[in-house]
Curated annotation (Swiss-Prot):
The gene is SUB11. GO terms for biological process: proteolysis. PROSITE patterns: SUBTILASE. This is Subtilisin-like protease 11. One of its GO terms (molecular function) is serine-type endopeptidase activity. Residues 20-117 form a propeptide. Glycans are attached at residues 138, 181, 252, 336-337, 396. The active site is at residues 159, 191, 346.
Length: 400
């Protein structure tokens, strides 16, 4: 009997060691209670993943049968991005414990909200970002750029939607997908149209000939769940693969929130699939190392500057920032044939995406090498960039 107890104790200890980790703190204000992101081990095959999802779905159903309906819907989305497997859902603690003890699971994290990284400032302010990124020295409004201007490159705006009929897109914009339940295929907030036009607009944008795809992953108030955004990323990779434009695509994420490991992995896998990913550093005037997607590997993280080449007071900073770009008082398109002025690292990121698209078109630079090229040709220095932060300022290599 004593030996049996020892064996049981050892087995329990081994099970505890092998159990997956639950990473997030449930006390965070942005965390969604009882909603989880479940990430599988790298060794799990697609078939094993499908089988596991079926198991988890059945497990939740059994829990509901025992406990009755409790408002938890169980399985939500599965994700397959460049060999990476994960899923999301809302589960009772009993079901969560079973998932954590499954040997195919690497870790589990709470689903949480993420937010746009821009805000409206003033109306009728002059636009200056185009001229700034096409000259090494400040002081001119002329925009000098390669005539191809992103031709043959596709820009995915993962945001609040895009007004694809806005004249600034010149008929180059199409609707892609909407992963936000209960919202229409439009941009009521305006943030997504503004960022997309900053990158690709005929008048206000950098890559004036790029194709534009609207991907709605944030609600009409500028907030979104990572479980939805990850589904949008999966869709973009699948769409780019289907259209044979891997290596000729840019994806912009002008969002910021607390660090989420599962989200970072999804973003990194998107980049490694062959899509250049520009992201916002965030607007908290703090180190972006603890922010997602800013801290994801393989992305080009942009912080924001003022018209005087200073770090914008709101901009995050830190070692994960790859480059600075114009982000304060940026004029661009907004829904219903309008224009507006916004500030934020949300505006800096599409400057990076737009210049990235122009260089991909003109020089054929691979997405994986593009951020390094932007850093190599960058101008500067940015004044007071922040602790452990680059002072490089985005430049399109025009020779001016």
């Amino acid at each position: 009997m004593a030996l049996f107890k020892v064996i049981l104790t050892a087995f329990a200890a081994l099970s505890a060691v092998d159990a997956a980790r639950l990473l997030s703190s449930p006390n965070d204000k942005d965390v969604v209670p009882n909603s989880y992101l479940v990430v599988m081990k790298d060794s799990v095959t697609s078939a094993e993943f499908d089988s596991h999802v079926t198991w988890a779905t059945d497990l939740h159903g059994e829990s509901v049968s025992r406990r009755g309906a409790d408002g938890l819907n169980g399985f939500k989305y599965s994700y397959k991005i460049n060999g990476w497997h994960a899923y999301s859902g809302s589960f009772h603690q009993e079901t969560l414990d079973e998932i954590l003890n499954n040997d195919k699971v690497d870790f589990v994290e709470h689903d949480r909200y993420v937010y746009i990284s821009g805000f409206v400032t003033q109306k009728d302010a002059p636009s200056w970002g185009l001229g700034r990124v096409s000259h090494r020295h400040n002081g001119t409004r002329d925009y000098v750029y390669d005539e191809r201007a992103g031709k043959g490159i596709t820009f995915y705006g993962v945001d609040t939607g895009i007004d694809i009929h806005h004249p600034d897109f010149g008929g180059r914009a199409v609707w892609g997908t909407n992963v936000v339940n209960g919202t229409k295929d439009n941009d009521r907030q305006g943030h997504g149209t503004h960022t997309a036009a900053t990158a690709t607009g005929t008048k206000y944008g950098l890559a004036k000939n790029a194709n534009v795809v609207a991907v709605k992953a944030l609600n009409d108030y500028g907030a979104g769940l990572w479980s939805n955004i990850m589904k949008a990323l999966e869709w973009c990779v699948e769409d780019a693969t289907k259209k044979n434009i891997i290596g000729k695509a840019v994806l912009n994420l002008s969002i910021s929130g607390g660090k989420v490991v599962a989200a970072n992995q999804a973003v990194t896998k998107t980049a490694k699939a062959g899509i250049f990913v520009s992201v916002a550093a965030g607007n908290d005037n703090q180190d972006a190392t603890n922010k997602s997607p800013a801290s994801a590997e393989g992305v080009c993280c942009a912080a924001a500057t003022t018209i005087r080449d200073d770090k914008a007071k709101f901009s995050n900073y830190g070692s994960v920032v790859k480059i600075y770009a114009p982000g304060q008082g940026i004029t661009s398109a907004t829904p219903n044939n309008s224009t507006g002025v916004m500030s934020g690292t949300s505006m800096a990121a599409p400057h990076v995406g737009g210049v990235g698209a122009t260089l991909m078109a003109s020089k054929g630079i691979a997405p994986a090498d593009l951020c390094a090229e932007l850093i190599k040709v960058a101008s500067g220095p940015v004044q007071n960039p922040g602790s452990s932060t680059t002072n490089k300022l985005l430049y399109n290599g025009s020779g001016q």
